Amino acid sequence: MSSDNESTPSQATVEMMATSPAKIKEYPEPLALHEVVVKDSSVFWDTLRRFHSIMSTKFMIPVIGGKELDLHVLYVEVTRRGGYEKVVVEKKWREVGGVFRFSATTTSASFVLRKHYLNLLFHYEQVHLFTARGPLLHPIATFHANPSTSKEMALVEYTPPSIRYHNTHPPSQGSSSFTAIGTIEGKFDCGYLVKVKLGSEILNGVLYHSAQPGPSSSPTAVLNNAVVPYVETGRRRRRLGKRRRSRRREDPNYPKPNRSGYNFFFAEKHCKLKSLYPNKEREFTKLIGESWSNLSTEERMVYQDIGLKDKERYQRELNEYRETLRLRDGDMTNGKAF
């Protein structure tokens, strides 16, 4: 870590969370070395979630153009250019956005990337890149959010499909694809529940993960990055309510999610440290992160192989689970037919 980087936080102003000094919110200790979180995405995601939990701040994965934004790539690209402040001053957000190769229909990508970085990664950057201590820092490069987009968390392409509407919601004539900005209201196995503002009208809808079309699929069968409008009837509302509740929590047969190699290493080391130092649990994450960074390539491969096998196990069990559901749904459909 260069000495130039370490001096940057001193340029920022202290952000007071309350008038009383006792209520000033302060930065925690780094959860891992910056070099480690840059090289290992699993360490990055683990420490980022823990960081937001410690800071009691909201954490979510933004969606741009119908795809989840890779915050690890965003963090790497911004920090290797000197951090948030430097990217803003040197106007390099368009350059950062070019790494993601957003679709041609995605607009305001630089604006959205900057906003998400400020909300989700700025304080994480201060702690892990610049090793900031004490009260929270506020960037000098002030972010002026457009009032019309200050609460928006997703950039999606809206393609009005040919669907059946109630009399109160007639289909629009001459509809075509265009880009709109909206908010993510919830997430489920197949996609996201979103809210999109089109002019003065606000539409609720479902943003599905686009599937790969088969040979027999018609052009209208797959709507990439499409927001499907819906009318909230009582029956529809109940069905969506069930989807919002995680199937993982409800169904005991749902396969156990896979863990990365670092997760296995973390669990192993955490167990050992807890038995040796039961009163120093707050320091374990940092110690384990340093231990992981000190492993040789061969030693690290042992855990990464375990993680790869666990990923294969999860994918195999997930395919079996989905096949079981498909057969069960098919049996139920056939039973209703008779």
UniProtKB/Swiss-Prot annotation:
Keyword vocabulary terms for this entry: Developmental protein, DNA-binding, Karyogamy, Nucleus, Transcription, Transcription regulation
Superkingdom of the source species: Eukaryota
Pfam family, one: ARID
Predominant place of localization: nucleus
SMART domains referenced in this protein's UniProt entry, alphabetically: ARID, BRIGHT, HMG
Entries under InterPro entries matching the protein: ARID_dom, ARID_dom_sf, ARID_HMGB9-like, HMG_box_dom, HMG_box_dom_sf
Cellular compartments per GO CC: nucleus
Gene3D superfamilies, per the entry: ARID DNA-binding domain, High mobility group box domain
Record-level GO BP terms: karyogamy; polar nucleus fusion; regulation of DNA-templated transcription
The entry's DNA-binding region: 255-322
Mutant phenotype after disruption: Failure of fusion of the polar nuclei during megagametogenesis.
Tissue: Predominantly expressed in leaves, flowers and seedlings.
One GO MF term attached to the UniProt entry: DNA-binding transcription factor activity
PROSITE patterns according to UniProt: ARID, HMG_BOX_2
Localization: Nucleus
Basic residues bias (residue ranges): 235-247
Ranges of residues in domain ARID: 38-129
Region Disordered, residue ranges: 233-259
Keyword Transcription regulation: yes
Job description of the protein: Binds preferentially DNA with A/T-rich content. Required for karyogamy during female gametophyte development, when the two polar nuclei fuse to form the diploid central cell nucleus.
Name of this protein: High mobility group B protein 9
Gene from which the chain derives: HMGB9
